[in-house]
Structures are given as structure tokens and as C-alpha cells.
Curated annotation (Swiss-Prot):
Protein name as catalogued: Heterogeneous nuclear ribonucleoprotein D-like
Alphabetical list of CDD domains matching this protein: RRM1_hnRPDL, RRM2_hnRPDL
Keywords attached to this entry: Cytoplasm, DNA-binding, Methylation, Nucleus, Repeat, RNA-binding, Transcription, Transcription regulation
InterPro entries: hnRPDL_RRM1, Nucleotide-bd_a/b_plait_sf, RBD_domain_sf, RRM_dom
Positions of the RRM domain: 30-112, 115-194
Species of origin: Gallus gallus
Gene: HNRNPDL
Gene3D superfamilies listed in its UniProt record: 3.30.70.330
């Protein structure tokens, strides 16, 4: 219990989810997925409970981006892999009156470390030179993509940065928000095409099974009128995406006995609450480097 007390005092010293996020595509034996959480369980509650099994270096509970309400699941990163084994040895875990379901989080096999990031909330007035200067400070940039609205020929409120290696991405993800130019931007890992396709399929499956029919797909429906928005919504939460897209677990295959409609899991992340990234008020009229077909090239990027 002394260990738990020590952790509860220092639990807020690290940026929530930053260390978990930075290694999401890499195998980390100290990382766990925690399902079945009570909506009332806080990050502090979860950290204090799990600290009895070992030192917790990062912990995050995923929330609805619009309501801020817990989705009932999260991730934890232990300092030592032995702590994960201790958690798994105990057959039953109860927290805040609910049985929780801790599982080992495993990165997808054969997945390369991320070298590309999504930058949301970018002011369309931010010049390409400003973008190069800021992101170049983290490492060597291979490519910058500045998506355009093909109807208005104006810059969108987001961009993509590709580095020559993964180290700059790790550094960037240590902080969720970055001040770039006049705007506060959110940095996420850009999902590869195969993950995007998986998410599309899972979205369709989730909508057909979820209660309320089409009502659950409101965010995606808005995007159908704008291809960029449809692709953007499917970035989900870049730190985690859909659990099965960013991580795999042999015993889950869709997180087993849990009802996705309750978590609204397939629609997690960039939905209606993030349409302010559209840049509709932008006046920056720089032409797209890829011409009229550039939009198709960067979807889902």
C-alpha cells in the first residue's frame, strides 16, 4: 500500500497518456488495456488501484471528445513487465463496485514505427515556412502535406508531417498540444491505409449492430459531403484509434463480451466535436501541390 500512496502523490506529474501514446505502435510488455471501468472511475482511482502491482508510469482513461464522459476503458503503462504478470495472475479485479477487465496490450505484428503525424487545429494562415521551422526542430522532415478544399481552393485547418525516422514523432507525442503560429494544435499519429480500411469496415459493422440505427453515425454522415472530412473523422483518436487497429489481443477480436454500442467505440475520436478543424473560415489560397487529385492522394492521409 505504500507503493500505491507514493504513486498517488506523483500520478499527475506526467502528461496523461503521453508515454503510452508515444509507443502505441511498438511492443511494450508493460502496457495494458483496461476494460469494464465504471464511468465514475478517475485516472487517479485507476492509478492507485494498479499501483499495488507495481510502479505506474502512465495511465489514461478514454473519454468522449464531445461530452467528456468516460468510455469505460483505458490504458496503463507499468515501469516493469513483471507488474503486468502480477495483474494477470489475479483472476478478479474490482474497482468502484465493478469488475474490471485488464488485458495485455500488444502492438500489431509487423507494424513499422510511426513517422507521420496529423496536426489538427492548424490556422490556415500559418505559412509553410512556419510549419517547417516548428516541426523541423524535432527532426528531419521528409514531406509536408497541406490539404486544400477543392471547392474553395483554401487551406484546410490541418496538415500532415512525415519525418525520415520515428524519433521526432516520439518527441512530438510527449505533448498532446503544441502552439504553432497563432493556434493551439493537437498532434496525433497518422494512421496507415490498411488501418484506415479496417476502421471503415469496423465502422460499418458497428453501425449495423449498434442501437439507434443511423443515429450513431452522425459524425461520419457529415463528412460524406466533404471527402477530407470523411477521411479525417476516420482518424479516430490518433493515440489509440480503434483498439483493434492500434493493438491486438488474441483473446479479444473486437473486445469480446463488451457492447461497443455502449462505449460508442467505433465512432471514438474525431467526430462531430472536431469539425472545427475544417478551416472553413480560411482565407489562405495556396494551390495544392498535387493539383485536383491531391485530395484523393491524402485520404486517409
Amino acid at each position: 500500500m505504500e507503493d500505491a500512496t507514493e504513486m498517488s502523490g506523483g500520478a499527475e506529474e506526467f502528461a496523461e497518456g503521453s508515454k503510452i501514446n508515444a509507443s502505441k505502435n511498438q511492443q511494450d510488455d508493460g502496457k495494458m488495456f483496461i476494460g469494464g471501468l465504471s464511468w465514475d472511475t478517475s485516472k487517479k482511482d485507476l492509478t492507485e488501484y494498479l499501483s499495488r502491482f507495481g510502479e505506474v508510469v502512465d495511465c489514461t482513461i478514454k473519454t468522449d471528445p464531445v461530452t467528456g464522459r468516460s468510455r469505460g476503458f483505458g490504458f496503463v503503462l507499468f515501469k516493469d513487465a513483471a507488474s503486468v504478470e502480477k495483474v494477470l495472475e489475479l483472476k478478479e479485479h474490482k474497482l468502484d463496485g465493478k469488475l474490471i477487465d485488464p488485458k495485455r496490450a500488444k502492438a500489431l505484428k509487423g507494424k513499422e514505427p510511426p513517422k507521420k503525424v496529423f496536426v489538427g487545429g492548424l490556422s490556415p494562415d500559418t505559412s509553410e515556412e512556419q510549419i517547417k521551422e516548428y516541426f523541423g526542430a524535432f527532426g528531419e522532415i521528409e514531406n509536408i502535406e497541406l490539404p486544400m478544399d477543392t471547392k474553395t481552393n483554401e487551406r484546410r485547418g490541418f496538415c500532415f508531417i512525415t519525418y525520415t525516422d520515428e524519433e521526432p514523432v516520439k518527441k512530438l507525442l510527449e505533448s498532446r498540444y503544441h502552439q504553432i503560429g497563432s493556434g493551439k494544435c493537437e498532434i496525433k499519429v497518422a494512421q496507415p491505409k490498411e488501418v484506415y480500411r479496417q476502421q471503415q469496415q469496423q465502422q460499418k459493422g458497428g453501425k449495423s449492430n449498434a442501437s439507434g440505427g443511423r443515429g450513431g453515425g452522425r459524425g461520419r454522415g457529415r463528412g460524406q459531403g466533404q471527402n477530407w472530412n470523411q477521411g479525417f473523422n476516420n482518424y479516430y483518436d490518433q493515440g489509440y484509434g480503434n483498439y483493434n487497429s492500434a493493438y491486438s489481443d488474441q483473446s479479444y477480436s473486437g473486445y469480446g463480451g463488451y457492447d461497443y454500442s455502449g462505449y460508442n467505440y467505433p465512432n471514438y475520436g474525431y467526430g462531430p466535436g472536431y469539425t472545427d478543424y475544417s478551416g472553413q473560415q480560411s482565407t489562405y489560397g495556396k494551390a495544392s501541390r498535387g493539383g485536383g487529385n491531391h485530395q484523393n492522394n491524402y485520404q486517409p492521409y
